[in-house]
Amino acid sequence: DMFDYTDESDGTKRLFDLIPIFYENGRESLILIDEIDRSLHTNLTRKFLELFFEIVEDRECQLVATTHDSNLLDLELLRQDEIWFVERQVDHSSKVFSLNKFKERFDKKIDKEYLLGRYGAIPIFDDDFVLEDAYEE
């Protein structure tokens, strides 16, 4: 029996969205993916990136992706200059900065340090935070 696409999980559908990237034939290309980890297990997202980097190794291809998956902040997967943070400012603008700015050792656990707030770009809640307050802005 053929499967019905509408019966598939969000993760399976997401994979169908991402797979064509591997068949990009252009020698020079820029690929943008918002929320690369959406509906995917962190290990699957990591494997996707590893395969992508292997396939495009001899091409002039650049991937720009956003994620909320801090497990991808790994210097065995990405170079320091490939990891960028976005931090919301008080005036609601965004500040973008590279991990390179922090001059970290290559053996450092970036994901743990990030979650501890070392690099900024994490949500900060005060003791009086109430969800309804977010809707009043």
Descriptions of predicted regions:
Residues 24-25, 55:
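Histidine kinase transmitter module recognition
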